[in-house]
UniProtKB/Swiss-Prot annotation:
Keyword set includes Amino-acid biosynthesis: no
Tissues in which the UniProt entry reports expression: Expressed in tissues with active cell division: apical root and shoot meristems, lateral root and leaf primordia, floral meristems and developing pollen.
Listed Basic residues bias regions: 1-10
Family: Belongs to the cyclin family. Cyclin AB subfamily.
Induction and repression of expression: By auxin in the roots, cytokinin in the shoot apex and sucrose in suspension cell culture. Down-regulated by salt stress in root meristem and shoot apex.
GO biological process, alphabetically ordered: cell division; mitotic cell cycle phase transition
CDD domains: CYCLIN_AtCycA-like_rpt2, CYCLIN_AtCycA_like_rpt1
Function: May negatively regulate endocycles and act as a regulator of ploidy levels in endoreduplication.
PROSITE patterns registered for this protein in UniProt: CYCLINS
Disordered: annotated segments: 1-61
Alphabetically ordered keywords of this record: Cell cycle, Cell division, Cyclin
InterPro entries cross-referenced by the UniProt entry: Cyclin, Cyclin-like_dom, Cyclin-like_sf, Cyclin_A/B-like, Cyclin_C-dom, Cyclin_N, Cyclins_cyclin-box
Name of the featured protein: Cyclin-A2-1
């Protein structure tokens, strides 16, 4: 009972002390309350911090003061420096009036860097009037120019309509119809860069003459027929021979070795299944050994810097024949054979080196169309567009080619004539025109 009464007394004291502390606005924790409750001495009130209340001004006065301070600290907003001059010119009059309203005297300052407004305005007005006058003159001149061009270019527009697109609708991916125009742009440049010399017989060679060169190529035509090589191989062979002899002296005894070596290289490049080296040695009746051919092959390739991808007459002839047949209702196979025949006739002639391969190909198509049909002009807008040659540019080449066509009977170089006199080529070597082609250029 004594313990219960003591506990009751302590709880009562603790409650009283806690209430006193709350009255004194002191934060009480449990430990502090317990400590105060255990001690029998009366608890001292905690020190109360007295905070002086600062007198606040009225809201109205504060707002007016803020406005005054803001007006004192307010500055002009930064602007784009490049607009300063223009804005100063435009707002000069307004600023002068505003200054007068403020009661301040202003004076006009004429210093360096300031613009005379009246002078600038008059100058701008003069410039604007000049510009408008020039624009009106240009507009009238352009209208007159359009009228003149429309009258002068009616024939050109008609010609453009007559050009047949030979690349559209081609399904064979090997024709590269999407890139054909760009490809032949590059080929036209390449034929100028990789062209053999036209005077190497005089400047470089001493034992070789044009006749010996013609005999070698005529024999290589027979070799290509013996091994059934494509015509691209024959054209590349002749190109390699001429390019090598343009910079290297060759003895007469090594001329045939050079011929079979160049055909071996061309066969490796163009043929699917090229003849073996031993076959080329055999075709010369074993005049040259295998080691001699290999040695010459290395010499030729090093001299040409291994540049074997060159445009030949056959490269252009393939495309020009397609352009010639595009305007025909029924393409004539005889025209293709005849153009190939004329082009191959030029291989044996040293004098044709002065003509570009593209020019020889275009002339072959021209002469072939004339030989088969004298009722129509052999050249049209489509051929002129794709060959890039006008009729006048073909004159010398066509006339020289016609001489080869008419004088084959008296020539000793008959391999090409014999080749195209076969039935598989429609015997086009026997075809001639009743009217000479020079009549076309004299009209």
């Amino acid at each position: 009972m004594h313990r219960a009464s003591s506990k009751h007394t302590n709880a009562k004291k603790e409650a009283i002390s806690t209430s006193k502390i709350r009255d004194n606005n002191v934060r009480v924790t449990r430990s502090r309350a317990k400590a105060l409750g255990v001690s029998n001495s009366p608890s001292k009130p905690a020190f109360k911090h007295e905070t002086k209340r600062v007198a606040r001004p009225s809201n109205k006065r504060m707002a007016s003061d803020n406005i005054t301070v803001c007006n004192q600290k307010r500055r002009a907003v930064l602007k784009d420096v490049t607009n300063t001059l223009a804005e100063s010119i435009i707002s000069t009059e307004g600023n002068v009036k505003a200054c007068k309203r403020g009661g301040k005297e202003t004076k006009q300052i004429e210093e360096d860097g300031l613009v005379d407004v009246d002078g600038e305005k008059s100058k701008l007005a003069e410039d604007l009037s000049k510009i408008r006058m020039v624009e009106s003159l240009d507009a009238s001149a352009s209208k007159q120019k359009l009228v003149d061009c429309a009258e002068e270019d009616r024939s050109d527009v008609t010609d453009c309509v007559q050009i047949v697109d030979i690349d559209s609708g081609v399904q064979d991916p090997q024709f590269c119809s999407l890139y054909a125009a760009s490809i032949y742009d590059s080929i036209n440049v390449a034929e100028l860069e990789q062209r053999p010399s036209t005077s190497y017989m005089v400047q470089v060679q001493r034992d070789i003459d044009p006749t010996m060169r013609g005999i070698l190529i005529d024999w290589l035509v027979e070799v290509s027929e013996e091994y059934k090589l494509v015509s691209d191989t024959l054209y590349l062979t002749v190109n390699l021979i001429d390019r090598f002899m343009s910079h290297n002296y060759i003895e007469k005894q090594k001329l045939q070795l050079l011929g079979i070596t160049c055909m071996l290289i061309a066969s490796k490049y163009e043929e699917i299944s090229a003849p073996r080296l031993e076959e080329f040695c055999f075709i010369t009746d074993n005049t040259y050994t295998r080691l001699e051919v290999l040695s010459m092959e290395i010499k030729v390739l090093n001299s040409l810097h291994f540049r074997l991808s060159v445009p030949t007459t056959k490269t252009f002839l393939r495309r020009f024949i397609r352009a010639a047949q595009a305007s025909d209702k029924v393409p004539l196979i005889e025209m293709e054979y005849l153009a190939n025949y004329f082009a191959e006739l030029t291989l044996t002639e040293y004098t044709f080196l002065r003509f570009l391969p593209s020019l020889i190909a275009a002339s072959a198509v021209f002469l072939a169309r004339w030989t088969l049909d004298q009722s129509n002009h052999p050249w049209n807008q489509t051929l002129q567009h794709y060959t890039r040659y006008e009729t006048s540019a073909l004159k010398n080449t066509v006339l020289a080619m016609e001489e080869l066509q008419l004088n084959t009977s008296g020539s000793t170089l008959i391999a090409i004539h014999t080749k195209y006199n076969q039935q598989k080529f429609k015997r086009v070597a026997t075809l001639t025109s009743p009217e000479r082609v020079n009549t076309l250029f004299s009209r």
